[in-house]
From Swiss-Prot:
Transmembrane segments: none
Name the UniProt record assigns to this protein: Chaperone protein SicP
Main location, first listed in the record: cytoplasm
Native organism: Salmonella paratyphi A (strain ATCC 9150 / SARB42)
Organism superkingdom: Bacteria
The keyword Cell membrane belongs to this UniProt entry's keyword annotation: no
UniProt keyword annotations, A-Z: Chaperone, Cytoplasm, Virulence
InterPro entries given in the database record: SicP (IPR044530)
Length: 116
């Protein structure tokens, strides 16, 4: 990604990529927890987007690529994934790049469903 990572006092690093891809990294004792904002989402939006979210969540789980989670207080859909192997910097960079690419793809797909 070519970006320096700076963590705050809460062990979090916030990244804004391409002006609309927001990702946070939370460094815990033995994992990095990645959170990527996908779309703002009202709990009363149509059924088709919730069905699509469940389909995508199943695919993510089957491929061990993370999960989608709805944050009620913020009315936001997040993409969440944990990096569990912190021993290899190249693996970490690869996982971060894969996460951001998947986040962008999910955002593009689900934005279309949110418009319907």
């Amino acid at each position: 990604m070519g970006l320096p990572l700076t963590f705050d006092d809460n062990n979090q690093c916030l990244l804004l990529l391409d002006s609309d891809i927001f990702t946070s990294i939370e460094a815990k004792d033995d994992i990095w927890l990645l959170n990527g904002m996908i779309i703002p989402l009202s709990p009363v939006c149509g059924d088709s987007i919730w069905r699509q979210i469940m389909v995508i969540n199943g695919e993510l789980a089957a491929n061990n690529e993370g999960t989608l989670a709805y944050i009620d207080a913020a009315e936001t859909l997040l993409f969440i994934h944990a990096i569990t192997d912190l021993t290899n910097i190249y693996h970490i960079i690869s996982q971060l790049e894969s996460f951001v690419n998947k986040q962008e793809a999910l955002k593009n797909i689900l934005q279309e469903y949110a418009k319907v």
